[in-house]
Protein backbone atom coordinates (compact mmCIF):
# COMPACT_ATOMS: atom_id res chain seq x y z
CA UNK A 1 0.00 0.00 0.00
CA UNK A 2 1.15 3.55 -0.66
CA UNK A 3 3.54 2.41 -3.39
CA UNK A 4 1.11 2.55 -6.31
CA UNK A 5 2.93 5.46 -7.92
CA UNK A 6 6.24 3.57 -7.79
CA UNK A 7 4.58 0.42 -9.17
CA UNK A 8 3.20 2.19 -12.23
CA UNK A 9 6.53 3.93 -12.78
CA UNK A 10 8.24 0.53 -12.83
CA UNK A 11 5.64 -0.79 -15.27
CA UNK A 12 6.18 2.17 -17.60
CA UNK A 13 9.95 1.72 -17.40
CA UNK A 14 9.66 -2.00 -18.13
CA UNK A 15 7.26 -1.54 -21.02
CA UNK A 16 9.27 1.35 -22.43
CA UNK A 17 6.11 3.43 -22.77
CA UNK A 18 6.33 6.12 -25.42
CA UNK A 19 6.31 9.70 -24.11
CA UNK A 20 5.51 12.41 -26.63
CA UNK A 21 8.19 15.07 -26.62
CA UNK A 22 7.86 18.57 -27.93
CA UNK A 23 10.27 18.84 -30.83
CA UNK A 24 10.23 21.13 -33.83
CA UNK A 25 7.01 22.95 -34.66
CA UNK A 26 5.70 24.97 -37.58
CA UNK A 27 5.30 28.73 -37.73
CA UNK A 28 2.04 30.38 -38.80
CA UNK A 29 3.11 30.00 -42.46
CA UNK A 30 3.75 26.25 -42.15
CA UNK A 31 7.55 26.46 -42.11
CA UNK A 32 9.46 24.16 -39.74
CA UNK A 33 11.18 25.77 -36.75
CA UNK A 34 14.12 23.99 -35.15
CA UNK A 35 15.97 26.71 -33.23
CA UNK A 36 15.14 26.93 -29.52
CA UNK A 37 14.45 30.67 -29.51
CA UNK A 38 12.25 30.44 -32.61
CA UNK A 39 10.21 27.63 -31.04
CA UNK A 40 9.73 29.61 -27.82
CA UNK A 41 8.68 32.71 -29.76
CA UNK A 42 6.20 30.68 -31.81
CA UNK A 43 4.63 29.19 -28.68
CA UNK A 44 4.30 32.63 -27.13
CA UNK A 45 2.85 34.04 -30.35
CA UNK A 46 0.29 31.22 -30.65
CA UNK A 47 -0.80 31.19 -26.99
CA UNK A 48 -0.90 34.99 -26.70
CA UNK A 49 -3.12 35.15 -29.78
CA UNK A 50 -5.33 32.32 -28.47
CA UNK A 51 -6.06 34.18 -25.22
CA UNK A 52 -6.02 37.71 -26.65
CA UNK A 53 -8.86 39.95 -25.53
CA UNK A 54 -11.26 41.34 -28.13
CA UNK A 55 -10.52 45.06 -28.48
CA UNK A 56 -14.18 46.02 -28.98
CA UNK A 57 -15.16 44.57 -25.59
CA UNK A 58 -14.20 47.10 -22.87
CA UNK A 59 -13.87 46.17 -19.20
CA UNK A 60 -16.66 47.17 -16.86
CA UNK A 61 -15.28 47.12 -13.34
CA UNK A 62 -17.48 47.71 -10.33
CA UNK A 63 -16.31 49.16 -7.05
CA UNK A 64 -15.29 46.95 -4.14
CA UNK A 65 -18.30 45.01 -2.85
CA UNK A 66 -19.23 45.83 0.74
CA UNK A 67 -22.03 43.27 1.12
CA UNK A 68 -19.74 40.31 1.78
CA UNK A 69 -20.44 36.60 1.98
CA UNK A 70 -19.65 34.84 5.32
CA UNK A 71 -15.96 34.90 6.28
CA UNK A 72 -13.58 32.07 5.45
CA UNK A 73 -13.03 29.72 8.40
CA UNK A 74 -9.73 28.12 9.37
CA UNK A 75 -11.34 24.69 9.06
CA UNK A 76 -12.16 25.48 5.41
CA UNK A 77 -8.50 26.25 4.73
CA UNK A 78 -7.39 23.09 6.55
CA UNK A 79 -9.83 20.89 4.64
CA UNK A 80 -8.85 22.48 1.32
CA UNK A 81 -5.14 22.07 1.99
CA UNK A 82 -5.60 18.40 2.87
CA UNK A 83 -7.64 17.81 -0.30
CA UNK A 84 -4.92 19.06 -2.68
CA UNK A 85 -3.27 16.07 -4.32
CA UNK A 86 0.39 15.37 -3.67
CA UNK A 87 3.13 14.88 -6.28
CA UNK A 88 1.68 17.54 -8.57
CA UNK A 89 3.69 19.99 -10.66
CA UNK A 90 4.21 23.41 -9.10
CA UNK A 91 3.13 26.71 -10.60
CA UNK A 92 5.29 29.70 -11.41
CA UNK A 93 6.47 30.10 -7.80
CA UNK A 94 8.02 26.62 -7.76
CA UNK A 95 6.68 25.85 -4.26
CA UNK A 96 5.62 22.18 -3.93
CA UNK A 97 2.40 21.31 -2.09
CA UNK A 98 4.39 18.99 0.19
CA UNK A 99 5.86 22.08 1.90
CA UNK A 100 2.41 23.08 3.19
CA UNK A 101 1.84 19.53 4.40
CA UNK A 102 5.08 19.72 6.41
CA UNK A 103 4.22 23.12 7.93
CA UNK A 104 0.74 21.85 8.92
CA UNK A 105 -0.98 24.28 11.34
CA UNK A 106 1.46 27.10 10.58
CA UNK A 107 0.58 26.85 6.89
CA UNK A 108 -3.14 26.82 7.72
CA UNK A 109 -2.89 30.00 9.80
CA UNK A 110 -0.76 31.81 7.24
CA UNK A 111 -2.99 30.86 4.28
CA UNK A 112 -6.15 31.65 6.25
CA UNK A 113 -4.85 35.17 6.89
CA UNK A 114 -4.01 35.71 3.21
CA UNK A 115 -7.31 34.23 1.97
CA UNK A 116 -9.34 36.31 4.41
CA UNK A 117 -7.54 39.46 3.23
CA UNK A 118 -8.42 38.61 -0.39
CA UNK A 119 -11.99 37.85 0.68
CA UNK A 120 -12.45 41.29 2.23
CA UNK A 121 -10.60 43.42 -0.34
CA UNK A 122 -11.36 41.29 -3.44
CA UNK A 123 -7.77 41.92 -4.54
CA UNK A 124 -5.53 38.98 -5.43
CA UNK A 125 -1.72 38.87 -5.12
CA UNK A 126 -0.21 39.24 -8.58
CA UNK A 127 1.84 36.05 -8.07
CA UNK A 128 -1.43 34.15 -7.71
CA UNK A 129 -2.59 35.52 -11.06
CA UNK A 130 0.46 34.16 -12.88
CA UNK A 131 0.18 30.79 -14.62
CA UNK A 132 2.44 28.40 -16.49
CA UNK A 133 1.04 26.74 -19.63
CA UNK A 134 2.27 23.25 -20.47
CA UNK A 135 1.38 22.07 -24.01
CA UNK A 136 0.09 18.46 -24.06
CA UNK A 137 -0.17 16.86 -27.54
CA UNK A 138 -3.53 15.71 -28.90
CA UNK A 139 -4.18 13.56 -31.96
CA UNK A 140 -2.90 14.98 -35.21
CA UNK A 141 0.25 16.64 -36.44
CA UNK A 142 2.48 17.31 -33.41
CA UNK A 143 4.18 20.15 -35.30
CA UNK A 144 0.99 22.25 -35.23
CA UNK A 145 0.50 24.30 -32.05
CA UNK A 146 -3.27 23.97 -32.45
CA UNK A 147 -2.96 20.21 -31.91
CA UNK A 148 -1.95 20.70 -28.28
CA UNK A 149 -3.96 21.19 -25.09
CA UNK A 150 -2.61 24.19 -23.19
CA UNK A 151 -2.85 22.90 -19.61
CA UNK A 152 -2.26 25.47 -16.89
CA UNK A 153 -0.11 25.03 -13.79
CA UNK A 154 -0.99 27.39 -10.95
CA UNK A 155 0.60 28.08 -7.57
CA UNK A 156 -0.50 25.56 -4.92
CA UNK A 157 -1.10 28.38 -2.43
CA UNK A 158 -3.62 29.99 -4.79
CA UNK A 159 -5.43 26.64 -5.16
CA UNK A 160 -6.54 26.95 -1.54
CA UNK A 161 -8.43 30.19 -2.20
CA UNK A 162 -9.71 28.93 -5.56
CA UNK A 163 -11.08 25.72 -4.03
CA UNK A 164 -12.83 27.68 -1.28
CA UNK A 165 -14.35 29.93 -3.94
CA UNK A 166 -15.46 26.88 -5.91
CA UNK A 167 -17.10 25.41 -2.81
CA UNK A 168 -19.03 28.65 -2.23
CA UNK A 169 -20.26 28.51 -5.85
CA UNK A 170 -21.55 24.96 -5.43
CA UNK A 171 -24.99 25.98 -4.15
CA UNK A 172 -25.54 27.98 -7.35
CA UNK A 173 -24.33 25.07 -9.49
CA UNK A 174 -26.89 22.75 -7.89
CA UNK A 175 -29.65 25.32 -8.30
CA UNK A 176 -28.98 26.61 -11.84
CA UNK A 177 -27.63 23.63 -13.77
CA UNK A 178 -30.08 20.97 -14.99
CA UNK A 179 -29.60 17.22 -14.61
CA UNK A 180 -28.66 16.90 -18.30
CA UNK A 181 -25.35 18.65 -17.49
CA UNK A 182 -23.13 15.97 -15.91
CA UNK A 183 -19.72 17.55 -16.49
CA UNK A 184 -17.55 17.83 -13.36
CA UNK A 185 -20.50 17.51 -10.99
CA UNK A 186 -20.53 15.44 -7.83
CA UNK A 187 -22.41 12.16 -8.20
CA UNK A 188 -22.49 12.39 -12.00
CA UNK A 189 -20.07 11.26 -14.67
CA UNK A 190 -19.52 10.04 -18.20
CA UNK A 191 -21.11 6.67 -17.46
CA UNK A 192 -24.41 8.37 -16.62
CA UNK A 193 -24.56 10.11 -20.00
CA UNK A 194 -23.53 6.95 -21.86
CA UNK A 195 -26.28 5.01 -20.04
CA UNK A 196 -28.80 7.78 -20.85
CA UNK A 197 -28.07 7.63 -24.57
CA UNK A 198 -28.27 3.83 -24.60
CA UNK A 199 -31.57 3.97 -22.71
CA UNK A 200 -33.01 6.57 -25.11
CA UNK A 201 -32.03 4.47 -28.13
CA UNK A 202 -33.49 1.36 -26.52
CA UNK A 203 -36.81 3.13 -25.85
CA UNK A 204 -36.92 4.57 -29.38
CA UNK A 205 -36.47 1.08 -30.80
CA UNK A 206 -39.07 -0.35 -28.38
CA UNK A 207 -41.70 2.18 -29.51
CA UNK A 208 -40.56 1.95 -33.16
CA UNK A 209 -39.54 5.59 -33.38
CA UNK A 210 -36.62 7.15 -35.20
CA UNK A 211 -34.05 9.01 -33.13
CA UNK A 212 -31.53 11.58 -34.39
CA UNK A 213 -28.40 12.65 -32.49
CA UNK A 214 -26.04 15.54 -33.22
CA UNK A 215 -22.73 15.39 -31.34
CA UNK A 216 -21.49 18.99 -31.25
CA UNK A 217 -17.79 19.82 -31.13
CA UNK A 218 -16.68 23.33 -30.20
CA UNK A 219 -13.39 24.77 -31.44
CA UNK A 220 -11.26 25.65 -28.36
CA UNK A 221 -14.38 26.06 -26.20
CA UNK A 222 -12.72 26.81 -22.84
CA UNK A 223 -10.22 29.18 -24.47
CA UNK A 224 -12.92 31.33 -26.11
CA UNK A 225 -14.97 32.30 -23.05
CA UNK A 226 -15.48 36.07 -23.03
CA UNK A 227 -14.83 37.36 -19.50
CA UNK A 228 -17.22 40.32 -19.58
CA UNK A 229 -20.03 38.15 -20.96
CA UNK A 230 -19.27 35.60 -18.24
CA UNK A 231 -19.68 38.17 -15.45
CA UNK A 232 -23.02 39.28 -16.92
CA UNK A 233 -24.15 35.65 -17.11
CA UNK A 234 -23.23 35.04 -13.48
CA UNK A 235 -25.20 38.13 -12.47
CA UNK A 236 -28.24 36.96 -14.44
CA UNK A 237 -28.05 33.57 -12.73
CA UNK A 238 -28.13 35.17 -9.31
CA UNK A 239 -24.54 34.54 -8.25
CA UNK A 240 -23.64 36.73 -5.27
CA UNK A 241 -21.96 40.01 -6.30
CA UNK A 242 -19.13 39.35 -3.85
CA UNK A 243 -18.24 36.02 -5.51
CA UNK A 244 -18.50 37.51 -9.00
CA UNK A 245 -16.21 40.38 -7.97
CA UNK A 246 -13.63 37.92 -6.64
CA UNK A 247 -13.75 35.99 -9.91
CA UNK A 248 -13.54 39.15 -12.03
CA UNK A 249 -10.51 40.43 -10.13
CA UNK A 250 -8.84 37.02 -10.34
CA UNK A 251 -9.07 37.07 -14.14
CA UNK A 252 -8.24 40.78 -14.53
CA UNK A 253 -4.56 41.28 -15.30
CA UNK A 254 -3.71 37.58 -15.51
CA UNK A 255 -0.29 36.73 -16.92
CA UNK A 256 1.12 33.50 -18.30
CA UNK A 257 4.21 31.88 -19.75
CA UNK A 258 4.57 28.70 -21.81
CA UNK A 259 6.91 25.95 -20.62
CA UNK A 260 8.53 24.35 -23.67
CA UNK A 261 11.25 21.77 -24.06
CA UNK A 262 13.64 24.70 -24.60
CA UNK A 263 12.70 26.73 -21.52
CA UNK A 264 9.90 29.16 -20.77
CA UNK A 265 8.67 32.06 -22.89
CA UNK A 266 8.31 35.68 -21.85
CA UNK A 267 5.26 36.59 -19.76
CA UNK A 268 2.16 37.79 -21.63
CA UNK A 269 -1.38 38.94 -20.78
CA UNK A 270 -4.44 36.66 -20.67
CA UNK A 271 -7.52 38.48 -21.97
CA UNK A 272 -10.11 35.72 -22.40
CA UNK A 273 -10.81 32.06 -21.74
CA UNK A 274 -10.99 29.84 -18.67
CA UNK A 275 -7.80 27.82 -18.45
CA UNK A 276 -7.84 24.03 -18.66
CA UNK A 277 -6.31 22.69 -15.47
CA UNK A 278 -7.85 25.27 -13.12
CA UNK A 279 -10.58 23.73 -10.95
CA UNK A 280 -12.81 26.79 -11.42
CA UNK A 281 -12.89 26.46 -15.22
CA UNK A 282 -15.41 23.57 -15.61
CA UNK A 283 -17.82 25.24 -13.18
CA UNK A 284 -17.63 28.61 -14.95
CA UNK A 285 -17.92 27.03 -18.39
CA UNK A 286 -21.00 25.08 -17.28
CA UNK A 287 -22.70 28.37 -16.35
CA UNK A 288 -21.64 29.81 -19.72
CA UNK A 289 -23.02 26.82 -21.65
CA UNK A 290 -26.26 26.77 -19.65
CA UNK A 291 -26.87 30.42 -20.51
CA UNK A 292 -26.52 29.90 -24.26
CA UNK A 293 -28.75 26.80 -24.16
CA UNK A 294 -31.44 28.83 -22.40
CA UNK A 295 -31.10 31.60 -24.97
CA UNK A 296 -31.46 29.00 -27.72
CA UNK A 297 -34.82 28.10 -26.18
CA UNK A 298 -33.71 24.60 -25.22
CA UNK A 299 -35.46 23.78 -21.99
CA UNK A 300 -36.01 20.53 -20.17
CA UNK A 301 -39.67 19.70 -19.61
CA UNK A 302 -40.88 16.72 -17.65
CA UNK A 303 -41.36 14.55 -20.73
CA UNK A 304 -39.09 16.24 -23.24
CA UNK A 305 -35.32 15.82 -23.03
CA UNK A 306 -33.59 17.07 -26.16
CA UNK A 307 -29.96 17.41 -25.07
CA UNK A 308 -27.26 15.84 -22.93
CA UNK A 309 -24.12 17.68 -21.84
CA UNK A 310 -20.77 16.92 -20.31
CA UNK A 311 -19.03 20.31 -19.93
CA UNK A 312 -18.43 21.40 -23.56
CA UNK A 313 -19.48 18.03 -25.06
CA UNK A 314 -23.06 18.71 -26.17
CA UNK A 315 -25.43 16.18 -27.71
CA UNK A 316 -28.71 17.27 -29.30
CA UNK A 317 -31.56 14.78 -29.76
CA UNK A 318 -34.76 14.84 -31.81
CA UNK A 319 -37.34 12.52 -33.34
CA UNK A 320 -37.04 14.06 -36.80
CA UNK A 321 -34.35 15.48 -39.05
CA UNK A 322 -36.09 18.86 -39.28
CA UNK A 323 -36.34 19.21 -35.50
CA UNK A 324 -32.67 18.29 -35.03
CA UNK A 325 -31.53 20.78 -37.66
CA UNK A 326 -33.63 23.52 -36.04
CA UNK A 327 -32.06 22.77 -32.63
CA UNK A 328 -28.56 22.81 -34.10
CA UNK A 329 -29.04 26.15 -35.86
CA UNK A 330 -30.40 27.74 -32.67
CA UNK A 331 -27.43 26.48 -30.65
CA UNK A 332 -24.98 27.62 -33.34
CA UNK A 333 -26.50 31.12 -33.43
CA UNK A 334 -26.46 31.60 -29.65
CA UNK A 335 -22.99 30.06 -29.33
CA UNK A 336 -21.55 32.60 -31.75
CA UNK A 337 -23.12 35.44 -29.74
CA UNK A 338 -21.02 34.47 -26.71
CA UNK A 339 -17.85 33.79 -28.72
CA UNK A 340 -18.06 30.01 -29.16
CA UNK A 341 -17.66 28.50 -32.62
CA UNK A 342 -18.83 25.08 -33.77
CA UNK A 343 -16.21 22.87 -35.37
CA UNK A 344 -18.34 21.56 -38.24
CA UNK A 345 -15.69 19.07 -39.37
CA UNK A 346 -15.81 17.30 -36.00
CA UNK A 347 -19.56 17.70 -35.41
CA UNK A 348 -21.27 14.41 -36.32
CA UNK A 349 -24.81 13.10 -36.77
CA UNK A 350 -25.98 9.59 -35.88
CA UNK A 351 -29.47 8.73 -37.12
CA UNK A 352 -31.62 5.61 -36.90
CA UNK A 353 -33.90 6.91 -39.67
CA UNK A 354 -33.50 8.43 -43.14
CA UNK A 355 -31.54 11.68 -43.33
CA UNK A 356 -30.34 14.04 -46.07
CA UNK A 357 -26.99 15.78 -46.38
CA UNK A 358 -26.62 19.01 -44.38
CA UNK A 359 -24.44 22.01 -45.09
CA UNK A 360 -23.66 24.77 -42.58
CA UNK A 361 -21.56 27.75 -43.69
CA UNK A 362 -20.51 25.82 -46.77
CA UNK A 363 -19.31 22.78 -44.79
CA UNK A 364 -21.05 19.40 -44.77
CA UNK A 365 -22.12 17.98 -41.41
CA UNK A 366 -21.11 14.33 -41.66
CA UNK A 367 -23.60 11.57 -40.87
CA UNK A 368 -21.88 8.50 -39.42
CA UNK A 369 -23.04 5.01 -38.45
CA UNK A 370 -21.17 5.10 -35.14
CA UNK A 371 -19.52 7.66 -32.85
CA UNK A 372 -17.21 7.50 -29.84
CA UNK A 373 -19.22 9.38 -27.20
CA UNK A 374 -17.33 10.08 -23.94
CA UNK A 375 -15.20 7.00 -24.57
CA UNK A 376 -18.03 4.64 -25.57
CA UNK A 377 -19.05 3.56 -29.07
CA UNK A 378 -22.60 4.59 -29.97
CA UNK A 379 -24.09 2.99 -33.10
CA UNK A 380 -27.12 4.01 -35.14
CA UNK A 381 -28.81 0.64 -34.58
CA UNK A 382 -28.35 0.86 -30.80
CA UNK A 383 -26.61 -2.51 -30.68
CA UNK A 384 -24.22 -2.60 -27.70
CA UNK A 385 -22.39 -5.69 -28.99
CA UNK A 386 -20.14 -3.39 -31.07
CA UNK A 387 -18.98 -1.61 -27.91
CA UNK A 388 -18.46 -4.91 -26.06
CA UNK A 389 -16.26 -6.23 -28.89
CA UNK A 390 -14.35 -2.94 -28.95
CA UNK A 391 -13.73 -3.10 -25.20
CA UNK A 392 -12.54 -6.70 -25.45
CA UNK A 393 -10.12 -5.71 -28.20
CA UNK A 394 -8.80 -2.78 -26.14
CA UNK A 395 -8.33 -5.09 -23.15
CA UNK A 396 -6.54 -7.65 -25.28
CA UNK A 397 -4.21 -4.94 -26.60
CA UNK A 398 -3.33 -3.83 -23.07
CA UNK A 399 -2.72 -7.41 -21.93
CA UNK A 400 -0.45 -7.97 -24.93
CA UNK A 401 1.56 -4.87 -24.00
CA UNK A 402 1.87 -6.16 -20.42
CA UNK A 403 2.78 -9.68 -21.51
CA UNK A 404 6.45 -9.27 -20.59
CA UNK A 405 5.50 -8.17 -17.06
CA UNK A 406 2.99 -10.94 -16.36
CA UNK A 407 5.44 -13.56 -17.63
CA UNK A 408 8.38 -12.09 -15.73
CA UNK A 409 9.76 -14.25 -12.93
CA UNK A 410 10.99 -11.10 -11.19
CA UNK A 411 7.37 -10.13 -10.40
CA UNK A 412 5.83 -12.26 -7.66
CA UNK A 413 2.48 -14.01 -8.15
CA UNK A 414 0.75 -12.06 -5.30
CA UNK A 415 1.72 -8.78 -7.00
CA UNK A 416 0.25 -9.96 -10.32
CA UNK A 417 -2.97 -11.12 -8.65
CA UNK A 418 -3.31 -7.97 -6.55
CA UNK A 419 -2.89 -5.66 -9.55
CA UNK A 420 -5.69 -7.52 -11.37
CA UNK A 421 -8.01 -7.48 -8.36
CA UNK A 422 -7.66 -3.71 -8.14
CA UNK A 423 -9.64 -3.29 -11.36
CA UNK A 424 -12.70 -5.15 -10.12
CA UNK A 425 -14.40 -2.00 -8.84
CA UNK A 426 -14.63 -0.39 -12.30
CA UNK A 427 -16.52 -3.25 -13.98
CA UNK A 428 -19.97 -2.13 -15.13
CA UNK A 429 -23.20 -4.15 -15.18
CA UNK A 430 -23.96 -5.89 -18.45
CA UNK A 431 -27.50 -7.15 -18.96
CA UNK A 432 -27.36 -10.61 -20.51
Q: Where would I find each of the regions flagged by the language model?
A:
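Non-catalytic, peripheral interaction segments enriched in hydrophobic/basic residues
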Residues: 1, 312, 374-381, 385-432
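Surface-exposed loop/turn segments and immediately adjacent short secondary-structure elements
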Residues: 2-146, 152, 156-160, 177, ...
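Conserved catalytic palm subdomain of right-hand nucleotidyl-transferase polymerases, strongest
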Residues: 24-25, 87-95, 143-153, 191-235
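Inter-domain linker/hinge segments that demarcate the starts of reverse transcriptase
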Residues: 74-83, 110-118, 164-169, 193-205, ...
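Active-site palm subdomain of RNA-directed nucleic acid polymerases
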Residues: 168-181, 284-315
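Catalytic palm subdomain of template-directed nucleic-acid polymerases
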Residues: 220-237, 310-337, 352-356, 377-383
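Short, conserved micro-motifs composed of acidic
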Residues: 262, 340-369
Amino acid sequence: MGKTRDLFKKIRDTRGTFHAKMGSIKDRNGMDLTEAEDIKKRWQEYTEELYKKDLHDPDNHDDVITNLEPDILECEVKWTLESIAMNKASGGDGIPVELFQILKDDAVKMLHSVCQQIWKTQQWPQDWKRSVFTPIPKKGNAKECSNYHTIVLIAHASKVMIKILQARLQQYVNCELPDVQAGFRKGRGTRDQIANICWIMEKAREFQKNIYFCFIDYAKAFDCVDHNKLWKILKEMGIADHLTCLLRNLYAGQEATVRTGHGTTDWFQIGKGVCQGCILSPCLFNFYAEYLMRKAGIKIARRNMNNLRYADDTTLMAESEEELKSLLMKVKEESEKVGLRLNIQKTKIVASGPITSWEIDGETVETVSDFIFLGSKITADGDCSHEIKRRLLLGRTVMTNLDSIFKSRDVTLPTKVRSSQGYGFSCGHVRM
